[in-house]
């Protein structure tokens, strides 16, 4: 064990360390807020007395919180006030300039968009244009109706039947025509097939004997409305089908043909 640990030493309590003391009228300001601004923690060297230990700011005034800052200090940054605030760089207009400083050309789409935004009426004047014939319409529904019915370029498109050589303008007309080949409506009594449901319904009445359509001028009745409509023409005063041989008139073309086939009186 070293000898220094075995030697008893007496400690003099009356002896104090020689700390440098400040003047009585000086005030030490710790880092805090000075009127809402942060006080710099790095003071100027000439303000401190010799022998101070910590880098704190010292001002010789009785009211430190309302006194002006020492000369040469800025309340915001702690740097000398001669430097002033660092102003932000002016905004650079990079909208139409490239990195070389020359103006970059604006595309046609951007120019059209800028002109449309500058003129609010241009947006209202925007119309729906047909891509086939370049006609414009104020509503989308009007454009759709034009494409379906009235567009000449669209009418040149045709839908062909896979069972025959017929062609149709619309797909709906083609589907109605295909039913004449497939005949989906079949009679359960005799097995006869029809393309339309109303044709099947009229056929079933020939089996049941039902005749719901009666003539108001005579006692005849019919199973189908179209037959009643043709019969009503016989009661009409207008008979537009005339025989060329005897000048006799008929209300229906079928009656005229029957008259000519049976033998016209004038022909003999």
Curated annotation (Swiss-Prot):
PROSITE patterns: ZINC_FINGER_C2H2_1, ZINC_FINGER_C2H2_2. One of its GO terms (molecular function) is zinc ion binding. InterPro entries: Snail/Krueppel_Znf (IPR050527), Znf_C2H2_sf (IPR036236), Znf_C2H2_type (IPR013087). Pfam families: zf-C2H2. A zinc finger (C2H2-type) spans 128-150, 159-181, 185-207, 213-235, 241-264. Phosphorylated by GSK3B. Once phosphorylated, it becomes a target for ubiquitination. Ubiquitinated by the SCF(FBXO11) complex; ubiquitination requires previous GSK3B-mediated SNAI2 phosphorylation. Disulfide bonds: none annotated. GO terms for biological process: regulation of DNA-templated transcription. It comes from the Eukaryota. GO terms for cellular component: cytoplasm; nucleus. Residues 80-117 are annotated as: Disordered. Keywords: Cytoplasm, Developmental protein, DNA-binding, Metal-binding, Nucleus, Repeat, Repressor, Transcription, Transcription regulation, Ubl conjugation, Zinc, Zinc-finger. It is found in: Nucleus; Cytoplasm. Residues 1-20 are annotated as: SNAG domain. Transcriptional repressor that modulates both activator-dependent and basal transcription. Involved in the generation and migration of neural crest cells. Plays a role in mediating RAF1-induced transcriptional repression of the TJ protein, occludin (OCLN) and subsequent oncogenic transformation of epithelial cells. Represses BRCA2 expression by binding to its E2-box-containing silencer and recruiting CTBP1 and HDAC1 in breast cells. In epidermal keratinocytes, binds to the E-box in ITGA3 promoter and represses its transcription. Belongs to the snail C2H2-type zinc-finger protein family. Repression activity depends on the C-terminal DNA-binding zinc fingers and on the N-terminal repression domain. Interacts (via SNAG domain) with LIMD1 (via LIM domains), WTIP (via LIM domains) and AJUBA (via LIM domains). Interacts (via zinc fingers) with KPNA2, KPNB1, and TNPO1. May interact (via zinc fingers) with IPO7. This is Zinc finger protein SNAI2. It comes from Bos taurus (Bovine). The lineage of its organism: Eukaryota, Metazoa, Chordata, Craniata, Vertebrata.
